[in-house]
């Protein structure tokens, strides 16, 4: 595995800056020694970081003839400019990023968000589409016009258009529903449990990213050429505001190396590049053959295929004809990273070495397979997003005369497009998505659910009990209380509770229940994502054989392993799983016992607690239709067969 | 004493140059010169000048209005709003020449209205020909830079003026951003401006039309010379340059020759010791009772705003703690404070929420504090120039003021030197020593507590930090 030569480049720059600092000190007739000391102090820190093994982090740029590349880009840009002028194209980029200052400022300041939603169908899948808009945002970019405009009328670089066509064919129904929001730089949240829909969505996103990166890079190169010519002729009054503080414009957060690799294939395909630099090295580090057991569910196979390393950061430079992996961050166009890998670079408050300047000018942030990242650690995602679009600490060679004015005014986050692709929307995703401030507005597409009640193929009693929680913060204690009172005590009193599987979402809830049951002398087994494999094996066996009557089982363990737990006679759900597939699988544990003959069908039962704060998860389990009647406050029980 | 000296306008054509017939640092001489010119003596100092020269006495009544000087209406209105009713002498003399497009050398002290004297012509020119990156003002200290930018902003508010302050000790990136927003006026300390010229890509002063050097003598004192040279090299030769200085040293003259073209020299002879409104006293006391005497003076003048000058930072810190322990609203101002803390301290004092400022010489010059009733010299400054500047904090703009110097047995020599420079003996401050000694016990206790507090917060770590910072404030203090 390639060791990362952490920030060799910045080191050089630091010496540079301290050099000029020295010079200044000399000018002031001051002692220079101190400045030297500063540099010395910093070096050990870097060595420390060199040992850190974040795959792909801060690679040093190999010898590249930047100027020649820029020239090529400028040539391409000139050609394209000719192409573009031929037809009347629809170009949302211009409307969004080159909006008139007075207008966007007034739109941003209004802060009046309006929401409307509609039910429609994408293909055969009924969906709900929610639009959230700022008042008057239409004056900048009329979204209805974006929707009316055909895909072929949008400005797309010819090479990308061809590449995308080859990769994708003509637009699918999913893509048709999405392209106006995506290409009009609206925030977009797309939830679907269908793998093929996800794939189609990703392809379109890859095309959009490629288009954004290539067009902006070419514009910069083209303008540089003009400036150079002007300088030769002694003209100084032309200026271009065409870039951010730092080069990277796109941030792609992916959970695993394999996901990164797969998305990269789409990007390469969609951008239609001829040349891939460092390809062998990238493939070696990110690609790994080998499938997951095919007995596991489909979405699990997809999520854990190939290289599941979740510690990497990768700078990618994308140009009209070539793509380069392992580009130095401050020269890259796209930063691919796992939340953990990027968080390690970004660091947290008080760390001696933090590096997040390269996130200052992100214009598109794409969260890929978001639910998986949620299971990894959502905090990392929040940290990383929190450090985007800030003023960098150092200039990193930025040409300030070309920085776009909305960066200078600190409004960059109002321009950033955030794209979230997920299987299902959870409260955490919702909170991130509703806190983005892109003035173009947002589009959220969620499926309408039929529910998972009938999927067991067998009549199973399913009881949903609503408890009362006054607020989100109160919910945790109220749930525990309700669980103990309604479920646990009655269960223990009845005496017959062998084969009870208690599903808790995370380790935190597991610990609380474990402590309580220890206190009450109730014997049980508990397995979580922190248990060793032997421990898990032992408890599963004991539970299957009926020697342990209760098994506590966490949702995160299920996410990472998808065990098939045997010997289940009753399922108790402490908190509904966000992933409806988990509920389906919990029911399958019961049907399996029935099939095996260890459980009478009439005795099989699944009990769940819920509150009004669980409606998103509940909707996916009982279906969109039923959830409405269940969405009330107060206590009540619902039984389904 | 305030007899209006007649205005002497002398126009001498550019004839010979290279006249370095000037004594370098005869400060006392300088002061004596100025006092002499008050007394209507013959033409002092600089025998050979290769420029138009105008001299005027500060106390002279101005009969002209801004409009008479040729200032355009919109700026006149702003002046009225800001209560600048009449031009001060330096403004009256320099603005007409400046509006003609001449370069200006101004010899004047802070408080004489010189900031507006250069701001108004710059703004007027900018008004007629709006363009970003129009003017650079160089100032020796951060505080002064902020004050200048405030004046510019106030005067230019009607025309939507944008200014940027670029000084050391603040975030380079924020400043780079401010510069790339293309301000009309940049107020800067030379070192940091050079830093930006060298390191901030995309920033240049190619279009500059005005250069103002404020307190040029201090700029040069603080070894900003090389930075100034660098700046002069990269800005266009086609420009107007204003140079303001308190004294005309040979260094300043060299700078003037290097940067100004056919300048008009406007000298305002400030009277340092106007007997009518500044009462200067001294208190002779034993060293060990210095604190007691100080507290007595403070308590006697309680309610008045005052500045106490001390020589060292730890003294300022100690005295402010001491006074606070005794219930007075005291606030220290010295170089160990961060930039924001300094501005904060100054603002608290300005707004009147604290009325005792204890300062090192950082604050002795360049700060425009509107009304101080009393200046106490806890230590006698080592040179008479500093003394003049310290007591110059009070009795400004025609108001009455008092200054008291605490002289201990160790300060005697310094004090005598100052008396010599002033050319007069100071009265002793009327106090009853018995009444003073009543304070001694409480003061001793408060002093002990103060020292204790200082030790408490002064760990070894902090010490090392202080050492680091020292270097930077030395440029503010401008010690010789």
Swiss-Prot record, chain A:
<dbReference type="GO" id="GO:0005730">
    <property type="term" value="C:nucleolus"/>
</dbReference>
<dbReference type="GO" id="GO:0000462">
    <property type="term" value="P:maturation of SSU-rRNA from tricistronic rRNA transcript (SSU-rRNA, 5.8S rRNA, LSU-rRNA)"/>
</dbReference>
<dbReference type="InterPro" id="IPR010678">
    <property type="entry name" value="UTP25"/>
</dbReference>
<feature type="compositionally biased region" description="Acidic residues">
    <location>
        <begin position="41"/>
        <end position="86"/>
    </location>
</feature>
<feature type="region of interest" description="Disordered">
    <location>
        <begin position="1"/>
        <end position="22"/>
    </location>
</feature>
<keyword id="KW-0687">Ribonucleoprotein</keyword>
<comment type="subunit">
    <text>Component of the ribosomal small subunit (SSU) processome composed of at least 40 protein subunits and snoRNA U3.</text>
</comment>
<dbReference type="GO" id="GO:0019843">
    <property type="term" value="F:rRNA binding"/>
</dbReference>
<keyword id="KW-0690">Ribosome biogenesis</keyword>
<dbReference type="GO" id="GO:0032040">
    <property type="term" value="C:small-subunit processome"/>
</dbReference>
<comment type="function">
    <text>DEAD-box RNA helicase-like protein required for pre-18S rRNA processing, specifically at sites A0, A1, and A2.</text>
</comment>
<keyword id="KW-0698">rRNA processing</keyword>
<feature type="compositionally biased region" description="Basic residues">
    <location>
        <begin position="1"/>
        <end position="12"/>
    </location>
</feature>
<comment type="similarity">
    <text>Belongs to the UTP25 family.</text>
</comment>
<dbReference type="InterPro" id="IPR053940">
    <property type="entry name" value="UTP25_NTPase-like"/>
</dbReference>
<dbReference type="GO" id="GO:0034511">
    <property type="term" value="F:U3 snoRNA binding"/>
</dbReference>
<dbReference type="Pfam" id="PF06862">
    <property type="entry name" value="Utp25_C"/>
</dbReference>
<feature type="region of interest" description="Disordered">
    <location>
        <begin position="34"/>
        <end position="93"/>
    </location>
</feature>
<protein>
    <recommendedName>
        <fullName>U3 small nucleolar RNA-associated protein 25</fullName>
    </recommendedName>
</protein>
<keyword id="KW-0539">Nucleus</keyword>
<dbReference type="InterPro" id="IPR053939">
    <property type="entry name" value="UTP25_C"/>
</dbReference>
<dbReference type="Pfam" id="PF22916">
    <property type="entry name" value="UTP25_NTPase-like"/>
</dbReference>
UniProtKB/Swiss-Prot annotation, chain B:
<keyword id="KW-0698">rRNA processing</keyword>
<keyword id="KW-0378">Hydrolase</keyword>
<keyword id="KW-0347">Helicase</keyword>
<dbReference type="InterPro" id="IPR050079">
    <property type="entry name" value="DEAD_box_RNA_helicase"/>
</dbReference>
<dbReference type="InterPro" id="IPR011545">
    <property type="entry name" value="DEAD/DEAH_box_helicase_dom"/>
</dbReference>
<dbReference type="InterPro" id="IPR014001">
    <property type="entry name" value="Helicase_ATP-bd"/>
</dbReference>
<comment type="subunit">
    <text>Interacts with the SSU processome.</text>
</comment>
<dbReference type="GO" id="GO:0006364">
    <property type="term" value="P:rRNA processing"/>
</dbReference>
<comment type="similarity">
    <text>Belongs to the DEAD box helicase family. DDX47/RRP3 subfamily.</text>
</comment>
<dbReference type="InterPro" id="IPR014014">
    <property type="entry name" value="RNA_helicase_DEAD_Q_motif"/>
</dbReference>
<dbReference type="GO" id="GO:0003724">
    <property type="term" value="F:RNA helicase activity"/>
</dbReference>
<dbReference type="GO" id="GO:0005524">
    <property type="term" value="F:ATP binding"/>
</dbReference>
<dbReference type="InterPro" id="IPR027417">
    <property type="entry name" value="P-loop_NTPase"/>
</dbReference>
<feature type="binding site">
    <location>
        <begin position="108"/>
        <end position="115"/>
    </location>
    <ligand>
        <name>ATP</name>
    </ligand>
</feature>
<keyword id="KW-0539">Nucleus</keyword>
<feature type="compositionally biased region" description="Basic and acidic residues">
    <location>
        <begin position="33"/>
        <end position="46"/>
    </location>
</feature>
<dbReference type="Pfam" id="PF00271">
    <property type="entry name" value="Helicase_C"/>
</dbReference>
<dbReference type="GO" id="GO:0005634">
    <property type="term" value="C:nucleus"/>
</dbReference>
<comment type="function">
    <text>ATP-dependent rRNA helicase required for pre-ribosomal RNA processing. Involved in the maturation of the 35S-pre-rRNA and to its cleavage to mature 18S rRNA.</text>
</comment>
<dbReference type="InterPro" id="IPR001650">
    <property type="entry name" value="Helicase_C-like"/>
</dbReference>
<feature type="compositionally biased region" description="Basic and acidic residues">
    <location>
        <begin position="1"/>
        <end position="17"/>
    </location>
</feature>
<dbReference type="Pfam" id="PF00270">
    <property type="entry name" value="DEAD"/>
</dbReference>
């Amino acid at each position: 595995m390639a060791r990362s030569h952490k920030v060799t480049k910045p080191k050089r720059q630091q010496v540079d800056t301290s050099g000029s600092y020295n010079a200044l000190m000399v000018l002031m007739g001051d002692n220079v020694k101190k400045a030297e000391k500063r540099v010395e102090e910093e070096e050990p820190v870097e060595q420390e970081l060199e040992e850190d093994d974040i795959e792909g982090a801060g690679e040093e740029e190999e010898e590249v003839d930047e100027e020649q590349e820029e020239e090529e880009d400028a040539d391409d840009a000139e050609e394209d400019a000719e192409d573009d002028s031929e037809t009347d194209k629809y170009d949302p980029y211009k409307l969004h990023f080159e909006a008139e200052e007075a207008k966007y400022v007034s739109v941003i300041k209004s802060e009046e968000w309006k929401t409307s939603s509609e039910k429609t169908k994408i293909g055969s899948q009924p969906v709900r589409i929610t639009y959230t808009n700022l008042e008057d945002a239409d004056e900048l970019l009329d979204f209805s016009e974006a929707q009316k405009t055909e895909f072929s009328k949008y400005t797309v670089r010819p090479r990308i258009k061809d590449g995308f066509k080859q990769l994708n064919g003509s637009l699918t129904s999913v893509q048709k529903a999405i392209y106006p929001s995506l290409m009009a730089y609206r925030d977009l949240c797309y939830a679907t449990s269908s793998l093929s829909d996800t794939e189609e969505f990703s392809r379109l996103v890859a095309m959009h990213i490629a288009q954004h990166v290539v067009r902006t890079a070419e514009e910069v190169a083209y303008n540089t050429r003009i400036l150079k010519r002007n300088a030769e002729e002694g003209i100084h009054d032309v200026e271009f505001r065409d870039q951010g503080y730092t080069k990277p414009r796109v941030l792609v957060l992916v959970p695993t190396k394999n996901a990164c690799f797969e998305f990269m294939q789409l990007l390469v395909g969609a951008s239609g590049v001829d040349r891939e630099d460092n390809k062998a090295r990238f493939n070696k580090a990110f690609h790994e053959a080998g499938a997951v057991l095919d007995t596991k569910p489909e979405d699990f196979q997809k999520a854990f295929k190939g290289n599941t390393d979740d510690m990497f950061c990768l700078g990618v430079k994308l140009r009209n004809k070539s793509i380069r992996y392992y580009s130095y961050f401050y020269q890259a166009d796209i930063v691919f990273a796992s939340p953990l890998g990027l968080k390690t670079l970004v660091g947290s408050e008080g760390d001696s070495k933090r590096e997040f300047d390269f996130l200052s000018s992100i214009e598109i942030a794409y969260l890929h397979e978001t639910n998986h990242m949620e299971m990894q650690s959502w905090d990392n995602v929040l940290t990383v997003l929190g450090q985007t679009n800030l003023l960098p600490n150092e200039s990193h060679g930025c040409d300030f005369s070309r920085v776009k004015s909305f960066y200078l005014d600190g409004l960059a986050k109002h321009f950033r497009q955030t794209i979230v692709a997920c299987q299902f929307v959870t409260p955490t995703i919702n909170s991130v998505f509703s806190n983005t401030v892109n003035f173009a507005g947002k589009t959220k597409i969620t499926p309408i659910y039929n529910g998972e009640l009938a999927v067991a193929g067998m009549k199973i009693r399913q009881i949903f009990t609503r408890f009362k929680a006054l607020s989100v913060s109160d919910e945790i204690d109220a749930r525990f209380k309700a669980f103990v009172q309604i479920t646990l005590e009655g269960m223990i009193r009845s005496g017959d509770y062998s084969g009870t599987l208690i599903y808790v979402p995370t380790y935190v809830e597991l610990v609380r229940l474990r402590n309580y049951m220890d206190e009450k002398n109730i014997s049980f087994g508990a397995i979580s994502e922190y248990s060793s494999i032997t421990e898990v094996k032992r408890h599963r066996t004991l539970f299957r054989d009926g020697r342990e009557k209760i098994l506590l089982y966490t949702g995160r363990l299920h996410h990472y392993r998808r065990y098939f737990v045997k010997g289940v006679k009753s399922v108790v759900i402490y908190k509904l799983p966000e992933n409806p597939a988990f509920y389906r699988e919990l029911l399958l544990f019961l049907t399996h016992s029935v099939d095996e003959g260890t459980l009478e069908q009439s005795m099989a039962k699944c009990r769940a607690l819920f509150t009004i704060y669980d409606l998103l998860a509940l909707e996916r389990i009982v279906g969109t239709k039923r959830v409405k009647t269940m969405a009330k406050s107060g206590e009540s029980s619902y039984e389904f067969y | 004493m305030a007899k209006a000296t007649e205005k002497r306008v002398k126009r001498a054509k550019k004839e010979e140059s290279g006249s370095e017939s000037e004594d370098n640092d005869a400060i006392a001489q300088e002061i004596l010169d100025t006092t002499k010119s008050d007394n209507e003596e013959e033409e002092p100092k600089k025998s050979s000048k290769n420029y138009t020269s105008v001299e005027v006495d500060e106390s002279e009544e101005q009969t002209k209005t801004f409009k008479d000087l040729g200032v355009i209406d919109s700026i006149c209105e702003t002046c009225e709003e800001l209560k600048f009713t009449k031009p001060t002498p330096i403004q009256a003399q320099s603005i007409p020449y400046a509006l003609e497009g001449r370069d200006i050398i101004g010899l004047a002290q802070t408080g004489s209205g010189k900031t507006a004297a250069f701001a108004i012509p710059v703004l007027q020119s900018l008004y007629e020909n709006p363009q970003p990156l129009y003017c650079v003002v160089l100032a020796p200290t951060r505080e002064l830079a902020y004050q200048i930018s405030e004046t510019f902003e106030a005067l230019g508010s009607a025309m939507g003026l944008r200014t940027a302050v670029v000084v050391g000790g603040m975030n380079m990136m924020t400043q780079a951003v401010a510069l790339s927003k293309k301000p009309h006026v940049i107020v800067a300390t030379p070192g940091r401006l050079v830093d930006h010229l060298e390191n901030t890509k995309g920033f240049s002063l190619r279009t500059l039309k005005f250069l103002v050097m404020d307190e040029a003598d201090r700029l040069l004192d603080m070894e900003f010379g090389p930075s100034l040279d660098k700046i002069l090299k990269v800005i266009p030769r086609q420009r107007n340059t204003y140079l303001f200085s308190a004294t005309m040293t040979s260094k300043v003259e060299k700078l003037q020759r290097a940067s100004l073209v056919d300048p008009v020299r406007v000298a305002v002879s400030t009277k340092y010791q106007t007997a009518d409104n500044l009462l200067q006293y001294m208190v002779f006391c034993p060293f060990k009772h210095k604190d007691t005497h100080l507290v007595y003076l403070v308590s006697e003048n309680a309610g008045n705003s005052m500045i106490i000058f001390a020589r060292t930072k730890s003294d300022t810190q100690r005295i402010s703690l001491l006074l606070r322990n005794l219930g007075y609203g005291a606030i220290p101002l010295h170089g160990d404070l961060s930039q924001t803390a300094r501005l904060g301290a100054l603002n608290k004092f300005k707004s009147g929420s604290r009325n005792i400022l204890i300062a090192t010489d950082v604050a002795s010059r360049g700060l425009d504090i509107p009304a101080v009733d009393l200046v106490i010299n806890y230590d006698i400054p080592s040179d008479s120039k500093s003394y003049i500047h310290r007591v110059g904090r009070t009795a400004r703009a025609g108001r009455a003021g008092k200054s008291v110097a605490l002289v201990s047995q160790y300060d005697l020599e310094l004090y005598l030197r100052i008396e010599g420079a002033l050319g007069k003996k100071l009265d002793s401050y009327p106090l009853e020593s018995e009444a003073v000694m009543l304070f001694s016990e409480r003061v001793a206790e408060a002093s002990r507590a103060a020292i204790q507090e200082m030790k408490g917060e002064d760990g070894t770590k902090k010490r090392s930090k202080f050492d680091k910072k020292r270097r930077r404030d030395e440029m503010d203090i401008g010690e010789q």
